[in-house]
Amino acid sequence: MTNLAKTFSDRYKSIAIVGKGAVGSAIAQSLDYLSINYDVYDSSDIEEIFDNCYDLLIYSGVNASKYHADRNPVTDKLHCLRAYDIFKNISAEEKILISTIDASRSFEQSSAYGNNRRLLETKIFQDRELFGNSKILRLPALYGSTVKKNAWYDSVKGADSITLNDDLLAKIDSECKKYHLDRTNYNILSFVNPQSEFAWYHLDTILRTIDRVTKSNEHVYQVISYDEAHKSGLLISHKELIERLGYRVEFISDSKILKYQSALFDENVYLMFEKSERNMYDEQWKEILE
């Protein structure tokens, strides 16, 4: 049994994960690898969690789509308020909310995605019942085998950043059908400015990061992968990311330039570096994505 497995087995007899997306799946895979039992829930069966009591709750069920949040800010706010209610009412000795560095006070004040998640964090820490046993882990841009939609994944796969609705296409009249719809206009190269700079985190270290969070006395944490920070001075531009992955592409985006440097040094937030055995440029990741 590894030290990490022993730590979790000794400290936590019952673990609950909320969310089956990239982060929740990565946590579940790590626990499976260490042969540690857990329960996992999502929106389809979340009501069942209230019948149980856990030693550790890892809540990764907040919608991670910035695109949809910024285009539907009211709906997204209601989603975050619902997440607060769920988080509050789950019975657990220790609770960790998986959040985002977009929630930093020093970053993107106009973003509904960041503002709504900051609201969620604020409500948790203003709640006396939650403050004592709750911690927040803010993650940056992610990479790893469970990631299925972000700049890294789309750049490697050449995947569409949004999916055109079939009903919408069906409404195009016959006269318009003679024109070719260039789907590259909906690709990640259109939506991400090549000069935007991101901090990155490898999800294969997520359980080790959570272990560090549970053992520390801070309340809010931000983490990035040490290797990527060391190579890039904390941040990597999207253009550099593409080139390091071995691709030569022509960027066609004039989207807003985002630089996450300020978000990493938010006031009263503990910044952690996590060393991974892999990096985002490994050939094995390209194979996983084939």
Model regions and ranges:
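Conserved catalytic-site region of short-chain dehydrogenase/reductase
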Residues: 97-108, 112, 142-147
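N-terminal Rossmann-fold NAD(P) dinucleotide-binding loop
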Residues: 24-25
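Active-site beta-alpha turn of Rossmann-fold NAD(P)-dependent dehydrogenases/reductases
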Residues: 61, 96-100, 138-140, 224
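NAD(P)-dependent short-chain dehydrogenase/reductase
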Residues: 125-198, 205
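Mid/C-terminal beta-alpha module of Rossmann-like enzyme folds, strongest
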Residues: 201-261, 266, 285-289
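Conserved N-terminal Rossmann-fold NAD(P)-binding element of oxidoreductases
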Residues: 17-19
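NAD(P)H-binding glycine-rich loop region in Rossmannoid oxidoreductase-like domains
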Residues: 46-92, 100-108
